[in-house]
Amino acid sequence: MVPATETVLVVDDEQGILEALADLLREEGYRVLTASHGREALERMAEVKPDLVLTDWMMPVLDGPALIERILQDPSLRDIPVLGMSAVDVNGLKRLHPAMEFLQKPFDIRALMKLVRRSLDANPRARRG
């Protein structure tokens, strides 16, 4: 278990995936915020700055790429690490966005948790507690 001071924002338009990821992260001790599209994620981040964003790539209203662009344009958000999730071939996404980490849906739970932990460990925002 990790301290509940680390907050992960999970963004996915598929309710079942959103709830499953939120439950899994809570079981691991993370504080979890959820959003069903990018615009809702930005609204959540206006209230609480997460230590990590885990976002689906293809969503209605505001998709993953547009969400990431908005995060990078905002000085108060740009240092938050973002992990992308997609049902499409993530190798192509990795070539387009080499600085980002991506998970292929369906993903291995252990691989997901290792990537979340590694991203949080590398983030000074999360380490400040």
Put a short name on every predicted segment.
Residues 12, 56:
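Active-site residues of response regulator receiver
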Residues 34-52:
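Acidic, metal-coordinating helix/loop segments flanking the phosphotransfer/catalytic sites
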Residues 59:
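Receiver (REC) domain active-site loop signature in two-component systems and cognate sites
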Residues 83-85:
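Hydrophobic/aromatic residues positioned on beta-strands within the core alpha/beta folds
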Residues 105:
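A Lys-centered signature of the CheY-like receiver
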Residues 1-7, 108-129:
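Non-catalytic signal-transmission and effector/linker regions of two-component phosphorelay proteins
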Residues 19-27:
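Charged docking surfaces used in two-component/phosphorelay signaling
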